[in-house]
Every structure is written in structure tokens, then in C-alpha cells.
């Protein structure tokens, strides 16, 4: 298998900006460079806009695939003197289709209502894709991998009310159906002994508390984020399995000098009950612990953290360096310094909209078993 996925994006990027206030029809259009407004223009004029990125990529499992990713971002202005302008809200989407006739459609939203009285977050996904199962535990063998395919339909809807400055409390609902499994013959998943290997429905209610005083939710320069949530998957509301997850997330940002940022993230996920294998905590993705195959390790619990240094280069280009460590585990006795997974790497940033700090990122992460490239809209955290 090719360890580093070859990914490239069409360079004909499209940026459409839609000013909130009407402009003089006779005003001269802003000067552009390769389709992008000058830093001065984007720093003062753009309050909302849409960025669309065509994608083409190849992996051995799906062969060639093409699609489009994008983000729509906006702010709601204050209508009264007592109100404040909201931070940036955003709606993201991605869809791609493969040479093997597989489809992935994903959407996510993070919306502040006027005066930030409420925060609405959610996610929708339909996925019909191949995946890889390396076993359960933090010491699984990379070479003992099973290929499988499945379909997934998922919906999450989070409603939060601001009860004190920067403090939000609310509820979440998660509904997901996993079906249409196809396995490698004589694989461990095919036996049906692993919970969730025959599919099912996961239905949960969640209790969520969030403290967020970051200056920008897309790409913070300063501030803190702390989130604590509990999700209860119950047969009484349609869940095939009964289990619970408690999630913790902390992020801190320091601006040590203009546009030089140190960012810290710590994350934990702790499960109880009979957890289907697709809902287990995982290690290996495009944000925390970059440098491992997707979902390389799975188990009930996860704990990990990362540190990232972000700094400008010139024009719209910036650079980052990052390091992280973490692991999955069933019991605390499974954790050890010898088994802990580390990640380090670097990346390039291209500012699509400097005013709202919206970046394209190209990262290379290196882990214990090799490295991977990642090309994505937005920061890792």
C-alpha cells in the first residue's frame, strides 16, 4: 500500500465575496492578483463570502476521485447599541465521488445568532466508502489490516444558549445509521463477534457546556475554549447499543508577537458500555496526531494533546510547526511511555481571506509508522 496518500487540488481557486452593505455601482472593482483581492481590500471590505475548492486525488482503495470542498462565512452585525457584532459563523461542505462509484457528502455548520445569544452547531453526512480496520487496542499490527466497505447516514444538531459572557449551555442530538457492510473474506469483522460489525442505529442525547472567548473561531490569535459534554446512547430513543461517552476539550492561544501564535490543544474521550467499533475512540486523522493512517488505532478511550506554532512568511503565506502525543486505551494500565503515539510536522498556510483569517493548509505529519500529507480548508484547531 502506498503509505503517503497522493493528494492534489486544482489551482483554479474561486473566491466570491458578498459585501453586507451595498456598494456604489460606479465604484472601481478591487485590484486582484491571480484572482485574489489585495491584503488591504480583504482586511477592510469582506464581511462574508464563499470559498470553493475543486479537488482531485488518488488512493489505492478508491482509485481516482473528484469533488469539491467549500466554506461560506459571515458575521451578523449589531442592530442596537447594546448589541455586539458576532464572531465569524461558517458553513462548510465537501462532496466527492470515486472511480469505484462511491460517494461522500458532508456538511457542518457553526452559527452565532445576533448578539451571540445562541450558538447553533451541527453536522450531516452520507458516506459510502471503503475503510480499513487494524484491530482494537493501542498495540495493533499495521500489517494485519482488514478492508471493508459500509454506508453511513449521520445527523447531529447542537443548540446552545449563552447564559453568561462566553459561557454556553445546551443540548445535542445525534442520530446515525450504519449499514451495507462488506468485508474481506474470513476477516475478524465478518465473524460478527465485534459489536457493530453488522451495523445498526446509534441514537443519543447530549448535554453540552462550552466556554469560548476566542477572538476568532476559525483561526484564533488569543483566548480559550473549554468544552465538556456527555452523550447517552439509549435503546429507548432508538439506539441499537447502550453506551455513554464523556468528552473534554481544551484549547488555548497566545499571540507572542503580531501574527505569531502558539496554540495548545488537549482532548479526552471516555466511554462506558457496549460501544460499536465505528463509535470507538480513534487515533489518526487530519487534526490531532497528524501522521498516522486514518483511524489507525481504536479503543474505548482516548487522551492526547498537541502544540502548534504559527507564523507569517510573506504576502498571504504562513507556516506552522507542530508536535503532539496521545493514545487510545481500554484501561489506564494499557497506557505506557513505550506505546504512546507521537506526531510532529510542519505545514504551509495560504490566506484566502486575511481579514477573517481563513486559510488553506498543507501539512506533513510524521508519526511512528511513517508520514502523511493533508490539504484542507481551515486550521486543525
Where are these regions (language model features)?
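Bacterial N-terminal signal peptides
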Residues: 8-17
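Surface-exposed extracellular loop regions of Gram-negative outer-membrane beta-barrel proteins
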Residues: 68-69, 73-90, 128-132, 208-237, ...
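Sequence/structural signature of outer-membrane beta-barrel proteins
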Residues: 73-77, 96-100, 127-131, 176-180, ...
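Short loop/turn motifs that connect adjacent beta-strands in outer-membrane beta-barrel proteins
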Residues: 24-25, 36-48, 76-88, 114-119, ...
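Transmembrane beta-strands of outer-membrane beta-barrel proteins
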Residues: 50-52, 89-93, 118-122, 167-171, ...
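Residues on the lipid-exposed face of transmembrane beta-strands in outer-membrane beta-barrel proteins
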Residues: 54-56, 68-72, 107-111, 157-161, ...
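C-terminal outer-membrane beta-barrel translocator/porin domains of Gram-negative envelope proteins
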Residues: 210, 216-313, 322
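Gram-negative/organellar outer-membrane beta-barrel architecture
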Residues: 42-50, 57-201, 283, 296-298, ...
Amino acid at each position: 500500500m502506498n503509505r503517503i496518500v497522493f493528494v492534489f487540488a486544482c489551482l483554479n481557486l474561486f473566491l466570491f465575496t458578498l459585501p453586507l452593505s451595498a456598494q456604489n455601482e460606479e465604484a472601481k472593482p478591487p485590484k486582484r492578483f491571480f484572482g485574489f483581492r489585495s491584503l488591504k481590500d480583504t482586511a477592510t471590505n469582506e464581511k462574508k463570502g464563499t470559498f470553493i475548492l475543486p479537488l482531485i486525488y488518488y488512493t489505492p482503495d478508491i482509485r481516482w476521485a473528484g469533488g469539491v470542498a467549500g466554506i461560506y462565512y459571515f458575521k451578523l452585525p449589531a442592530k442596537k447599541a447594546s448589541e455586539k457584532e458576532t464572531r465569524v459563523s461558517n458553513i462548510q461542505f465537501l462532496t466527492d465521488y470515486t472511480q469505484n462509484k462511491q460517494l461522500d457528502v458532508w456538511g457542518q455548520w457553526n452559527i452565532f445568532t445576533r448578539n451571540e445569544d445562541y450558538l447553533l452547531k451541527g453536522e450531516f453526512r452520507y458516506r459510502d466508502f471503503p475503510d480499513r480496520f487494524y484491530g482494537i487496542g493501542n498495540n495493533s499490527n499495521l500489517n494485519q489490516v482488514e478492508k471493508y466497505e459500509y454506508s453511513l447516514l449521520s445527523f447531529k444538531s447542537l443548540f446552545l444558549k449563552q447564559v453568561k459572557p462566553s459561557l454556553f449551555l445546551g443540548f445535542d442530538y445525534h442520530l446515525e445509521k450504519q449499514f451495507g457492510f462488506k468485508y474481506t473474506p474470513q476477516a475478524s469483522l465478518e465473524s460478527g463477534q465485534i459489536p457493530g460489525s453488522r451495523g445498526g442505529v446509534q441514537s443519543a442525547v447530549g448535554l453540552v457546556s462550552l466556554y469560548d472567548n476566542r477572538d476568532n473561531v476559525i483561526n484564533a490569535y488569543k483566548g480559550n475554549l473549554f468544552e465538556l459534554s456527555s452523550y447517552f446512547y439509549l435503546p429507548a430513543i432508538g439506539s441499537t447499543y447502550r453506551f455513554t461517552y464523556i468528552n473534554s476539550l481544551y484549547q488555548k492561544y497566545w499571540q507572542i508577537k503580531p501574527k505569531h501564535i502558539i496554540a495548545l490543544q488537549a482532548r479526552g474521550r471516555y466511554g462506558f458500555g457496549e460501544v460499536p467499533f465505528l463509535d470507538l475512540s480513534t487515533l489518526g486523522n487530519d487534526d490531532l496526531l497528524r501522521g498516522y493512517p486514518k483511524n489507525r488505532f481504536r479503543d474505548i478511550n482516548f487522551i492526547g494533546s498537541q502544540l502548534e506554532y504559527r507564523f507569517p512568511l510573506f504576502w498571504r503565506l504562513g507556516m506552522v510547526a507542530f508536535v503532539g502525543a496521545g493514545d487510545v486505551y481500554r484501561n489506564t494500565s494499557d497506557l505506557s511511555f513505550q506505546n504512546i503515539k507521537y506526531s510532529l510536522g510542519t505545514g504551509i498556510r495560504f490566506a484566502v481571506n486575511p481579514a477573517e483569517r481563513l486559510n488553506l493548509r498543507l501539512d506533513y505529519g510524521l508519526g511512528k509508522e511513517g508520514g502523511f500529507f493533508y490539504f484542507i480548508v481551515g486550521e486543525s484547531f
